[in-house]
Swiss-Prot record:
Protein name (Swiss-Prot/TrEMBL): Meiotically up-regulated gene 93 protein
Matching Gene3D superfamilies: Tetratricopeptide repeat domain
Protein's GO biological process: meiotic cell cycle; protein-containing complex assembly
Key word Oxidoreductase present: no
Xref: PROSITE patterns: TPR (PS50005), TPR_REGION (PS50293)
Function: Has a role in meiosis.
GO cellular-component term (any): nucleus
Organism: Schizosaccharomyces pombe (strain 972 / ATCC 24843)
Highest rank taxon of the organism: Eukaryota
InterPro entries: RPAP3, TPR-like_helical_dom_sf, TPR_rpt
Length: 383
């Protein structure tokens, strides 16, 4: 028995040593390639183009980064990496690469148009966010909640609500909270921490984190979705000045940001006709949609609520959870991660999640973003 155990230990040690030598050989190969850029650079450039056509954008960034280490002045590779960054939801990185590519090729009109379009769309997004930050429009009587709920929440229905900068007071009741020392940014901090953990998990499993070790994109996505902290939230959602939607356009925009944060730069909003068809297909009327808009207005992002208003928001959600269409909207329109944000009230109970048909853990669910693709940009700008 002891001899067999010794043999197994020797085999394991030999296997580990072999794997280590393979990694060392791959790294040495890459270092040697730096001195022989004429033969190796086209290999990375061709593979990046292949991955770009297959929409494997993480591998495109991986190959383009290697190619740029060898030759940092390759215009094709710089353009492709910027395009991959844009598809992955990093417009600022795409802007950086495209500006670098434009410096190398200032007469390229296509890059100029793409940069102008990118900055224009991003500016429109920021302008709308700032506009919604300042005010909420007056709600017509036909779009208000039933009389019983209006009596329960009188201060929210009446008039206009002007959003101010973050302060120590509750932004809904407009008065100083009884517990003035209460940390109103606790929930935003939790969302920020979840974002940090999710990004760290993504970086640890990224192909560029380990030289020479390839991992398929499907395996990478499975590792991320199965992780405990896999909630990637746009930065606008855990900042205190993000407004609640008050009309159909703002509602559609919020759905877009929450359901597909990596796409909201390119596809700015859903077509209203599509969302109307979706509601009609499930027997939902415009009045029900308006009721849901008002429920979002009350709930908002619960990170801005003091404890008093969090309790009232919870009771409102319990009242709305009895409606047959509410669980469908939560599950299919806002998607599971958005529902977690909207229902993330302090000291939430598991029973309440079950009543709302929402799970605490992220699950693979169908969202509206799968029906809408990014506006295509030709990938053969330099080919």
């Amino acid at each position: 028995m002891e001899e067999k155990e010794n043999v197994n230990l020797v085999e394991k040690s030999n296997y580990v040593a072999l794997e280590n030598t393979r990694e060392i050989d791959v790294f040495d190969e890459f270092l040697n390639a730096i001195g022989n850029e004429n033969t190796i650079t086209p290999v990375y450039a061709d593979s990046s183009l292949t991955h770009l056509r297959k929409k494997s954008y993480t591998k495109v960034v991986h190959d383009c980064t290697y190619a740029l280490v060898i030759n940092p002045y390759d215009k094709k590779v710089i353009w492709r990496r910027g395009l991959a960054y844009l598809r992955l939801g990093h417009p600022h990185l795409a802007n950086r690469d495209w500006e670098h590519s434009l410096e190398l090729d200032p007469n390229n009109t296509y890059i100029q148009k793409s940069l102008h379009r990118l900055k224009e769309v991003y500016y429109i997004y920021r302008e709308c966010a700032e506009t919604w930050q300042l005010r909420h429009l007056r709600v017509a009587s036909s779009q208000q909640l039933p009389v019983g709920l209006r009596k329960q929440y009188p201060n929210i229905i009446r008039g206009k609500i002007w959003w101010k900068k973050v302060h120590d007071n509750c932004q809904l009741c407009g008065q100083q909270c009884e517990l003035k020392k209460e940390n109103l940014s606790a929930m935003r901090s939790m969302l920020y921490m979840a974002n940090t953990y999710a990004k760290d998990d993504t970086e640890n499993h990224s192909p560029s984190a380990q030289i020479g070790i390839e991992s398929s994109e499907d395996e990478l996505e499975n590792k991320i979705t199965k992780g405990e902290h896999s909630l990637l939230v746009p930065e606008e959602l855990y900042r205190s000045n993000y407004p609640c939607p008050q009309n159909i356009d703002q509602f559609l925009y919020m759905i877009k940001v929450l359901s597909a944060p990596c796409l909201y730069i390119e596809t700015f909003s859903f077509p209203i006709s599509t969302i109307n068809q979706l509601f009609k297909a499930h027997g939902m009327s415009v009045e029900q949609l308006n009721l849901f808009l008002k429920s979002i207005h009350y709930i908002g992002l619960c990170s801005r609520f003091c404890k008093q208003w969090s309790d009232k928001a919870r009771s409102l959600m319990q009242a709305l959870s009895g409606l047959p269409w509410f669980s469908f909207v939560v599950q299919h329109c806002l998607h599971i991660t958005a529902a977690q944000i909207l229902l993330h009230i302090p000291d939430i109970q598991e029973e309440e999640f079950r009543n709302w048909h929402v799970s605490k853990k992220p699950i693979n669910n169908t969202d509206l973003s799968s029906e809408f693709e990014i506006a295509e940009i030709p990938i053969n700008c330099y080919t």
